[in-house]
Amino acid sequence: MAQFYSAKRRTTTRQIITVSVNDLDSFGQGVARHNGKTLFIPGLLPQENAEVAVTEDKKQYARAKVVRRLSDSPERETPRCPHFGVCGGCQQQHASVDLQQRSKSAALARLMKHDVSEVIADVPWGYRRRARLSLNYLPKTQQLQMGFRKAGSSDIVDVKQCPILAPQLEALLPKVRACLGSLQAMRHLGHVELVQATSGTLMILRHTAPLSSADREKLERFSHSEGLDLYLAPDSEILETVSGEMPWYDSNGLRLTFSPRDFIQVNAGVNQKMVARALEWLDVQPEDRVLDLFCGMGNFTLPLATQAASVVGVEGVPALVEKGQQNARLNGLQNVTFYHENLEEDVTKQPWAKNGFDKVLLDPARAGAAGVMQQIIKLEPIRIVYVSCNPATLARDSEALLKAGYTIARLAMLDMFPHTGHLESMVLFSRVK
């Protein structure tokens, strides 16, 4: 008779070692060296010693977790959020803001092989004007969870407060939770978004089943009592306006309207400074023709139009092109035009590009702009400002400009998301004469 044996699970004993941390990476992990190998340890800061357990051992590097911290860095801070360390939203509340900015700037400088000229920052707390909170009904307790995802998990952290949220939004958290937790449709809710616009506060509720008249009435009463613009989203395509007018925000003296689902920069303060610095770096003159690629609904395009002879905004999403045109009309700007184009194709052959451009600005998504770099080079602008939310693709795309005879004149780290691992940046390229 054949006999079958289950293979015994291999057990590994985690090695406990003592390390000294000498650096902080841009994601907020302490960096140490052990046996000639780089070791990444979340939760530790430079100048700290600790006993750590190795959790992952690769050929080039290893990861570890803290068993016992033996000393504290002078730049260690007490996290303001009670959910820090569990919630996946923030990774660096234990580090001083100055240390966070230095570590991100150093990472950017290494990637770009160029010194960081400046850090563009604003308030480090209460800066986030948009939040998307996951909702989950717990049948056992008949309670509604509302919060953000746990670090490295799809589980939800039931968030009671969030100090990086705009104060108006943080104050709403318990009230929104109580309202949604009283709905008959509590088990059919997907997420809720809160947005703080200049025009007021928005609440967008994603529900996966039709709402009863009683639930709709309850939501309307809540929105009126809290002064919210209320939107209901039964699916990803439909958005019903229950109350409120078209929202808008200020951008360098202009009023930009947007749909509740449109992308807007989360950090209003840094956005204002970023736009102002981009215009300054481009040195826009009254006779200039300026091209804005990946322009969205005109965050840079419209402020550029207040200084240049003419501005062309190019965007791949038709709805954003329409919104840009609408915003130009609302602000009385007649020297700006928006075009819907596939930026992977050669747009330099379009009629609007035949006269060339003196200056170019681009603000692509995380994938970068590899498909348009040669097109920009063909246009031969004097100055180029590249705004990036991914330093790796920025470094890759920059190579084409450097080979074409451009040099990096300025490099800024944008502290758009304090206390997180997100690193944004802006570069000025100048053509060598």
Swiss-Prot record:
One GO MF term on file is:
4 iron, 4 sulfur cluster binding
List the EC numbers from the record.
2.1.1.190
Q: Which residues form the active site?
A: 389
UniProt catalytic activity: uridine(1939) in 23S rRNA + S-adenosyl-L-methionine = 5-methyluridine(1939) in 23S rRNA + S-adenosyl-L-homocysteine + H(+)
Q: Which residues bind [4Fe-4S] cluster?
A: 81, 87, 90, 162
User: Oxidoreductase as a keyword?
Assistant: no
Query: Single Gene Ontology BP term?
Result: rRNA base methylation
Please name the CDD domains in this protein's record: AdoMet_MTases
Q: Could you tell me which PROSITE patterns the record lists for this protein?
A: SAM_MT_RNA_M5U, TRAM, TRMA_1, TRMA_2
Record-listed S-adenosyl-L-methionine binding positions: 265, 294, 299, 315, 342, 363
The UniProt function text for this chain reads:
Catalyzes the formation of 5-methyl-uridine at position 1939 (m5U1939) in 23S rRNA.
Instruction: Give the protein name, as stated in the record.
Output: 23S rRNA (uracil(1939)-C(5))-methyltransferase RlmD
Q: Identify the species of origin.
A: Shigella flexneri
